[in-house]
Design a protein with these regions (language model features):
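Short glycine-rich catalytic loops that host catalytic nucleophiles or stabilize transition states
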Residues: 183-186, 254, 286-287
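Alpha/beta catalytic cores of group-transfer enzymes, especially the acyltransferase/condensing modules
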Residues: 11-12, 35-39, 95-241
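Short, flexible loop segments at boundaries between secondary-structure elements
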Residues: 222, 282-302
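Short, solvent-exposed amphipathic alpha-helical segments in soluble enzyme
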Residues: 23-24, 142, 173-174, 276-280, ...
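FabD-like malonyl-/acyl-CoA
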Residues: 2-134, 179, 260-290
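A short, acidic, amphipathic alpha-helical segment used as a generic capping/interface helix at domain edges
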Residues: 241-258
Length: 302
């Protein structure tokens, strides 16, 4: 049996209109989430609405779970799930550890807390072509910035005030970086600057039932599989304030014998970053590959 890995991306991959082309699976998720939060998600799917973190995060959860349900209905079952940042909530729903209704409410709160903590003047920046040691040298020399995501051997993300990121960009280029570019996130995610909102989110989790996952849930913060519901709550609540390593998570998935990585919408960034890790398997972006074709490609691999 092919071992399939469902991966849910984080912010930075979104584009307005993502919820306007949903099929019946996506529309039922949209309706369930809209009812849960008392807002029509379709009205939050525009360039203007996407300037607010919570609207982007809700759209990503909706698109991801819609696709997940479509693939499962077509007979593609995951052996492992993981999500980067907001994607972790999609992974927890896919693992049957968190209900979609609870996830929708928590994600709305999470986005509002993140946006409220840093309404403006903060962000994230991807640096290409420098290793982790060099990136950490740069963050140590510039105030208030942190290494927040280790995406691959050659891509590191920094978080902090925009003024400090500008200084870091110049230093990175001086050290030989191929690029230093801002990503579409308006808050300093995955660093200690978000510890206060994370604690508030943790309190909200106390009113929610989180079960033992039915599908192994891989943390992109620790690179380990989590079964214990208490540890899962900790992972979901605090992931906004902790460094992520997609590099380590992809490696951990490979070591668990994963043959096929399927990235949920939107985009295919995590899959392309993990291409070298899964060189002898299949990496598929479900945004651009119809379910029938995914089944066919998995069949050819067997």
């Amino acid at each position: 049996v092919m071992r399939v890995f469902f991966v849910f991306p984080g912010q930075g991959t979104q584009r307005p209109g993502i919820l306007h082309g949903l099929n019946t699976f996506g529309l039922s998720v949209l309706e369930e989430m809209s009812n849960a939060i008392g807002l029509d998600l379709l009205t939050l799917d525009s360039a203007e609405a996407f300037e607010r973190t919570e609207n982007v995060q809700l759209a990503l959860l909706c698109a991801g779970i819609g696709k997940c349900r479509e693939l499962e209905a077509a007979g593609i079952q995951p052996s492992l799930v993981a999500g980067l940042s907001i994607g972790a909530f999609g992974a927890a729903v896919a693992a049957h550890a968190l209900s979609l209704t609870d996830a929708a409410r928590l994600v709305l709160l999470r986005g509002r807390l993140m946006q409220g903590a840093y309404p403006s003047g903060y962000g994230m920046m991807a640096i290409g072509g420098l290793n982790l040691n060099t990136a950490e040298d740069i963050t140590n020399a510039v105030d208030d910035i942190y290494v927040s995501n280790i995406n691959s051997e050659q891509q590191i993300v920094l978080s902090g005030p925009l003024s400090s990121l500008d200084i870091a960009a110049k230093r990175a280029k001086d050290r030989g970086a191929l690029y230093a570019k801002r990503i579409q996130v308006t808050v300093p995610s995955h660093c200690p600057l978000l510890m206060c909102p994370a604690k508030v989110l943790m309190e909200a989790f106390q009113k929610v039932e989180v079960k033992r996952p039915k599908v192994p849930y891989l943390s992109v913060n620790s690179g380990r599989v989590i079964w214990d519901p208490t540890k899962l709550v900790d992972d979901l609540a605090f992931n906004m304030a902790r460094r992520t390593s997609w590099l380590d998570a992809a490696q951990a998935a490979k070591e668990r014998g994963i043959d096929v990585l399927i990235e949920m919408p939107p985009g295919g960034i995590l899959g392309s970053l993990a291409q070298t890790t899964f060189a002898d398997g299949l990496v598929i972006s479900s945004s651009t590959t119809p379910a029938e074709e995914i089944i066919e490609r998995i069949g050819r691999l067997q």
